[in-house]
C-alpha cells in the first residue's frame, strides 16, 4: 500500500461502525468458560431502561472497555457482561408521566397487568436504544450474555435469595418509621434520601396543663404534626421542668391528653428546652416513643395529606393544614412566636418530593449480623477499593448500618414472594419456585400475594451472581468467572449498590462478589452565570456557552463555575453528540484523560477538540510511516534488526518505549486512567513523531547514511508503529484497528519464524486476526547502555539551547543555519550531530577548539559546551540591540540590589527571609548579566 492508497484524512463516521461489525461478526467479544486462560470477568453496572445514555454512562463504560481490552490483549479470558436495570421507581415514574402526557391517564386508570404491559413495551424500546449507544462507545461486551434485572433468571435468583434470608431470620416484616415519598407513594431506603438545607421557621406553641392554669411552650419546625403528638419531653436534669414530669397537657384541636416525660436525649438549650414527641412522624421521636411506650398516631395519607386523625383539618394538604393550624393557634392564644431557622430537609432522589417519616408496615433486611463480614472483606484486602481514600467511607457506613427497608409500593419490580392468608395476616408462605405455592393453588380464595415489589437494589445486589447463571450452582460461567475480577462504578453508589452486592452475594455464595472495586469521580461541567446590575443572575446556554467552553474570554458580569451536570444549569454534554462531532476515540481519550482518582472530574469541552486533533496526528503519522514501509515485506521483519546498526536516536526511542510499557503497567494496576491516556498520547506525539521521525527523516529520504541504515530505520519504524498501535488500542480502539489492518494488508502473508528481540513481538501481533486480539506490547528485550541515555539527554539539552537561540532572535524555523560547538571532548558530541541538525534546523555543525575570534553568531552554554549559531547580519544587529536593552535593565537591577543590601539598617530590620531572597536575586542577576556581556563581547 502506498500513500496514494492511504486516505489523507481519517473518516471516523464510516470506519467506526464498519469495524464494530467486523469485531462482533468474528466473535471477538465472546468469552469461553472452557478456556484454560486465566479468567478476567467484569459486570457492567446496568444502565436504567428509562431513556438514553448520559456522560456518566459514557465514562464508566469507557473505563471498563479500556480495562477489558487491555486484559484481553494481555492473555486473559475476558468476560464482560452487559445488561440493563429495570430501575423500579425511576422507570415507573417515567412511564407514568409518558402515559399522562400521551393518553391523559394515570397509573390507577389501568389494571396492574395492563400498566405493566406499557412498561415492558417502554423497556424494550429504551433498552434497544441504550444497547445501540453502548456499541457506539466501542464497548467490547459479550452480547450473547446480555442480562436484564427482571428477566426470568434474575427473578429466580431474587426469590431464592429472599427465601434464604427469610428462613434464616434475616428478613422480617414490621411497623417502622420509613422514608415515605408522597409523590411516588412508596417507602425509600435511608440512602435513597438526599438532604438539602433550606430556610424555615421555628414555631413556639403553648400547650395547656390538664387541671391547671399553667402551660408549657415547645419549639417545633412542623406545627402540623402536633395533631399526632403523644408526649412532651424535657431533660430530667432541667430544673425548670423537673416538677412537671408526669403531668399531662392537652393537644390542641384533637381532644387528646398526653404526658410530659423526662428523656436524657432532650437538649435543654434548644428552643425552650421542651419538645413535642410525634413518634409516627419523626425518627428521633419514634425511638423516644418506643422507649416510653407512647402511642404512635399517623396523621398523614399516602399522598401526604392530613388523614382522619387530623380532627378539623382532615382532608387538607399538609401545607394548607399548617396555615390553618397557625391561624387557629393564634386565635386561641396558643401561638407564641416564630423565628428564622435553617432546616435540613430530606428529599426523594427520584421524585424530588420532600420525604415524610411515615409509620408503615414494611419488609426489612436485618443487617447487624452482616457487619463483621462486610468489614472483614475490606480490612483484610480480600476486596481492594481504589482509590484507597474511599475505604474509610465504606467502613464508616458499615459501622452505622441500619436495617434495610426492601419493600416498595410500586407495580414495576420483583413481586415480593410472600402470600398471606386472608383470615390471618401473620400466616405467610414464602415461595421461591415457579408459579404459585401448592397450598395457594389448592385454596386460591384464601390467599393473596403481597402487592409490593422489592427495592431495585435488592435485585441489583445479586447482579454479579445472576449475570453468571446463579442460582444454578453448576453454571459453567459461575465456576469460571466468579468471583468477578473488578467492579467499576461511581463513588456515589458505594453504599447504594457496592455494599449491598457484598452483603447479598457473599451471603448467598459464601464468596466475595469481586476482588477489586474502582470508584470513579462524578463528572462536572462548566456553567456560566450572567449577573445584572441588581445582582440577579441566569444561566447561559447555547452558542454563547459553547463559545466560552472553547476558550472565548468571559465578559464583565459573566462568571464560570464547575458544577454537576444539569440541564437546568446548561452544562450537560451529550456523549452521542460528541461522538458524532469528534469521533468515538476522541471522546474515549478525553474521558480517560480526565479520570483522575478524585471525587470530581472537571470535563473540559476543549479536550474533545484536542483529542480529535490527536487522532488526526496518529493518522497522519501512520500515513507518513506507510510512505516509507509500503514495500516492506514479512520476511524483512523475520530477518530482524542488527543491533550494531542502531544509532543513538534508535536506542533513545527503544528506551522511551520500554519506559512507556513499565509506566503503563503501573497505571493499569492502579487504575490511573488519566496516565494511561496521556502517557500513550505523549509518546506518540512527542517521542515518536516530533523527535524520532524528525531525526531519521534525512536517512529515510536518502540524505544521510547508506542503504543498510535506511533499511534498519524502515524496519524499526514499522515495528514501532505496530507496537504503539497496540499500546493505544485500549483507549482508541477504532483508529488503531483501522491502521493495524492496513499494516497487515501491506505486509501480506507472514512467513514462519520468530524474528528477533526487536521484531519478534510485532510478528506475533501481526499473526492475530485483529489488533484487539493481538498480544499486548512488551518492553524490547534489549539493554540500553547508560552512556547512550546520557548522550541523548545531552542532545536534548543542546536542541533546547538551539531552539532558544532561534526563538530569542526570531529566526524563521525554515531557515537552515550553520553552527559550531566548542568543547574539550568531541567524541560524545559527534554522535549527537545528526540529532542536532534534524531537530535544530541546522545545515552543518563544526567542532572547534575555540570560538571564532570574530563572526556573526549567537551562542549558548550547556555545562562546559559552548554552542554557536551563525546568523544573518540583520538578525545579529537586532539581537545585539535586544541584548543591550537587557544589559541596561540587569545593570540597574544589580545596582539597586547592591545598594539595598549595603544598607545595614535594612539588613538588620528586614525579615531574614526577605534579605535572603534579595541576596539570591542579586546572585542570579549577576549571573544573567555576565551571560549577556559575554554574548555582546562576541559581537565586537
UniProtKB/Swiss-Prot annotation:
Keyword tRNA processing among record annotations: no
Residues given in the record as ATP binding sites: 567
GO molecular function: aminoacyl-tRNA deacylase activity; ATP binding; valine-tRNA ligase activity
GO aspect biological process, one term: valyl-tRNA aminoacylation
Gene3D superfamilies per the UniProt record, alphabetical: HUPs (3.40.50.620), Isoleucyl-tRNA Synthetase, Domain 1 (1.10.730.10), Valyl-tRNA synthetase, C-terminal domain (1.10.287.380)
Catalysed transformations (reactions): tRNA(Val) + L-valine + ATP = L-valyl-tRNA(Val) + AMP + diphosphate
Sequence motif: 'HIGH' region, positions: 47-57
Its EC number(s): 6.1.1.9
GO CC term (a single one): cytosol
Keyword ATP-binding: yes
Keywords annotated in UniProt: Aminoacyl-tRNA synthetase, ATP-binding, Coiled coil, Cytoplasm, Ligase, Nucleotide-binding, Protein biosynthesis
Coiled-coil region: 873-905
Record NCBIfam families: PRK05729.1 (NF004349), valS (TIGR00422)
Family: Belongs to the class-I aminoacyl-tRNA synthetase family. ValS type 1 subfamily.
Domain notes: ValRS has two distinct active sites: one for aminoacylation and one for editing. The misactivated threonine is translocated from the active site to the editing site. The C-terminal coiled-coil domain is crucial for aminoacylation activity.
HAMAP family xrefs: Val_tRNA_synth_type1
Function field: Catalyzes the attachment of valine to tRNA(Val). As ValRS can inadvertently accommodate and process structurally similar amino acids such as threonine, to avoid such errors, it has a 'posttransfer' editing activity that hydrolyzes mischarged Thr-tRNA(Val) in a tRNA-dependent manner.
Complex formation: Monomer.
Name of the molecule in the record: Valine--tRNA ligase
Taxonomic source organism: Chlamydia pneumoniae (Chlamydophila pneumoniae)
Amino acid at each position: 500500500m502506498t500513500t496514494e492508497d492511504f486516505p489523507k484524512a481519517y473518516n471516523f463516521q464510516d470506519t467506526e461502525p464498519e469495524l464494530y461489525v467486523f469485531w462482533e461478526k468474528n466473535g471477538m467479544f465472546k468469552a469461553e468458560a472452557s478456556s484454560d486462560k486465566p479468567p478476567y470477568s467484569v459486570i457492567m453496572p446496568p444502565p436504567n431502561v428509562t431513556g438514553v445514555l448520559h456522560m456518566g454512562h459514557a465514562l464508566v463504560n469507557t473505563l471498563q472497555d479500556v480495562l477489558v481490552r487491555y486484559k484481553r490483549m494481555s492473555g486473559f479470558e475476558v468476560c464482560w457482561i452487559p445488561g440493563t436495570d429495570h430501575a423500579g421507581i425511576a422507570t415507573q415514574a417515567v412511564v407514568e408521566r409518558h402515559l399522562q402526557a400521551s393518553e391523559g391517564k394515570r397509573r390507577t386508570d389501568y389494571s396492574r397487568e395492563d400498566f405493566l404491559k406499557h412498561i415492558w413495551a417502554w423497556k424494550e424500546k429504551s433498552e434497544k436504544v441504550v444497547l445501540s449507544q453502548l456499541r457506539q462507545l466501542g464497548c467490547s461486551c459479550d452480547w450473547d450474555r446480555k442480562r436484564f434485572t427482571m428477566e426470568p433468571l434474575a427473578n429466580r435468583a431474587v426469590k431464592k435469595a429472599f427465601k434464604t434470608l427469610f428462613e434464616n431470620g434475616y428478613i422480617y416484616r414490621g411497623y417502622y418509621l420509613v422514608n415515605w415519598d408522597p409523590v411516588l407513594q412508596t417507602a425509600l431506603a435511608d440512602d435513597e434520601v438526599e438532604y438539602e438545607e433550606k430556610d424555615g421557621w421555628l414555631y413556639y406553641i403553648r400547650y395547656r396543663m390538664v387541671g391547671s392554669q399553667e402551660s408549657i411552650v415547645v419549639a417545633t419546625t412542623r406545627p402540623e404534626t402536633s395533631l399526632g403528638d403523644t408526649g412532651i419531653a424535657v431533660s430530667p436534669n432541667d430544673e425548670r421542668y423537673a416538677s412537671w414530669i408526669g403531668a399531662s397537657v392537652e393537644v390542641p384541636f384533637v381532644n387528646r391528653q398526653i404526658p410530659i416525660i423526662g428523656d436524657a436525649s432532650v437538649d435543654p438549650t434548644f428552643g425552650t428546652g421542651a419538645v413535642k414527641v410525634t413518634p409516627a412522624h419523626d425518627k428521633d421521636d419514634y425511638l423516644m416513643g418506643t422507649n416510653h411506650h407512647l402511642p404512635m398516631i399517623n396523621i398523614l395519607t399516602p399522598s401526604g395529606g392530613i388523614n382522619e386523625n387530623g380532627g378539623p383539618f382532615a382532608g387538607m394538604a399538609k401545607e394548607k393544614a399548617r396555615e390553618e393550624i397557625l391561624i387557629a393557634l393564634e386565635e386561641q392564644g396558643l401561638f407564641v412566636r416564630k423565628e428564622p431557622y435553617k432546616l435540613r430537609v430530606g428529599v426523594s432522589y427520584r421524585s424530588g418530593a420532600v420525604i415524610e417519616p411515615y409509620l408503615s408496615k414494611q419488609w426489612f433486611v436485618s443487617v447487624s449480623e452482616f457487619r463483621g463480614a462486610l468489614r472483614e472483606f475490606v480490612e483484610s484486602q480480600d476486596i481492594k477499593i481504589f482509590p484507597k481514600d474511599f475505604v474509610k467511607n465504606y467502613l464508616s457506613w458499615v459501622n452505622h448500618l441500619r436495617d434495610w427497608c426492601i419493600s416498595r409500593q410500586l407495580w414495576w419490580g420483583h413481586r415480593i414472594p410472600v402470600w398471606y392468608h386472608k383470615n390471618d395476616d401473620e400466616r405467610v408462605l414464602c415461595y421461591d419456585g415457579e408459579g404459585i405455592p401448592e397450598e395457594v393453588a389448592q385454596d386460591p380464595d384464601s390467599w393473596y400475594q403481597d402487592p409490593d415489589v422489592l427495592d431495585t437494589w435488592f435485585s441489583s445486589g445479586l447482579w454479579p451472581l445472576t449475570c453468571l447463571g446463579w442460582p444454578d450452582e453448576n453454571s459453567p460461567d459461575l465456576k469460571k468467572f466468579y468471583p468477578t475480577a473488578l467492579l467499576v462504578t461511581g463513588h456515589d453508589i458505594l453504599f447504594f449498590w457496592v455494599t449491598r452486592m457484598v452483603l447479598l452475594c457473599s451471603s448467598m455464595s459464601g464468596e466475595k462478589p469481586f476482588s477489586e472495586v474502582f470508584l470513579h469521580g462524578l463528572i462536572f461541567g462548566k456553567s456560566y452565570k450572567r449577573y445584572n446590575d441588581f445582582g440577579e443572575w441566569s444561566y447561559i446556554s447555547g452558542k454563547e456557552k459553547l463559545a466560552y467552553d472553547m476558550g472565548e474570554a468571559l465578559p464583565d458580569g459573566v462568571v464560570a463555575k464547575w458544577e454537576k451536570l444539569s440541564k437546568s444549569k446548561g452544562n450537560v454534554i451529550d456523549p452521542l453528540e460528541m461522538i458524532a462531532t469528534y469521533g468515538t476515540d476522541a471522546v474515549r481519550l478525553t474521558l480517560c484523560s480526565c479520570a483522575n482518582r478524585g471525587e470530581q472530574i472537571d470535563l473540559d469541552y476543549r479536550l474533545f477538540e484536542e483529542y480529535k486533533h490527536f487522532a488526526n496526528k496518529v493518522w497522519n503519522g501512520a500515513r507518513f510511516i506507510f510512505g516509507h514501509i509500503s514495500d516492506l515485506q514479512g520476511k524483512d521483519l523475520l530477518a530482524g534488526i542488527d543491533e550494531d546498526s542502531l544509532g543513538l536516536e534508535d536506542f533513545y526511542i527503544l528506551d522511551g518505549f520500554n519506559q512507556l510499557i513499565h509506566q503503563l503497567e503501573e497505571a493499569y494496576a492502579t487504575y490511573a486512567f488519566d496516565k494511561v491516556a496521556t502517557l500513550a498520547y505523549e509518546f506518540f506525539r512527542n517521542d515518536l513523531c516530533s523527535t524520532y521521525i524528525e531525526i531519521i527523516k534525512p536517512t529515510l529520504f536518502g540524505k544521510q547514511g547508506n542503504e543498510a541504515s535506511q533499511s534498519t530505520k524502515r524496519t524499526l519504524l514499522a515495528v514501532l508503529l505496530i507496537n504503539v498501535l497496540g499500546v493505544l488500542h485500549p483507549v482508541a480502539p477504532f483508529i488503531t484497528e483501522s491502521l493495524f489492518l492496513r499494516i497487515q494488508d501491506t505486509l501480506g502473508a507472514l512467513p514462519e519464524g520468530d524474528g528477533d528481540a526487536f521484531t519478534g513481538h510485532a510478528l506475533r501481533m501481526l499473526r492475530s486476526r485483529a489488533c484487539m486480539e493481538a498480544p499486548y506490547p512488551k518492553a524490547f528485550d534489549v539493554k540500553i547502555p547508560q552512556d547512550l541515555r546520557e548522550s541523548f539527554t545531552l542532545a536534548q539539552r543542546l536542541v533546547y539551547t538551539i531552539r532558544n537561540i532561534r526563538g530569542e532572535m526570531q529566526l524563521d524555523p525554515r531557515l537552515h543555519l550553520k553552527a559550531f560547538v566548542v568543547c574539550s571532548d568531541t567524541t560524545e558530541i559527534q554522535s549527537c550531530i545528526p540529532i542536532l541538525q534534524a531537530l535544530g534546523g541546522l545545515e552543518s555543525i563544526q567542532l572547534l577548539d575555540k570560538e571564532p575570534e570574530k563572526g556573526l553568531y549567537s551562542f549558548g552554554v550547556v555545562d562546559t559546551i559552548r554552542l554557536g549559531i551563525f546568523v544573518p547580519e540583520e538578525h545579529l544587529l537586532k539581537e545585539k540591540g535586544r541584548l543591550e536593552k537587557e544589559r541596561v535593565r540587569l545593570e540597574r537591577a544589580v545596582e539597586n540590589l547592591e545598594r539595598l543590601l549595603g544598607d545595614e539598617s535594612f539588613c538588620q530590620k528586614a525579615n531574614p527571609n526577605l534579605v535572603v531572597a534579595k541576596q539570591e536575586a542579586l546572585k542570579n542577576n549577576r549571573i544573567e548579566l555576565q551571560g549577556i556581556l559575554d554574548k555582546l563581547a562576541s559581537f565586537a
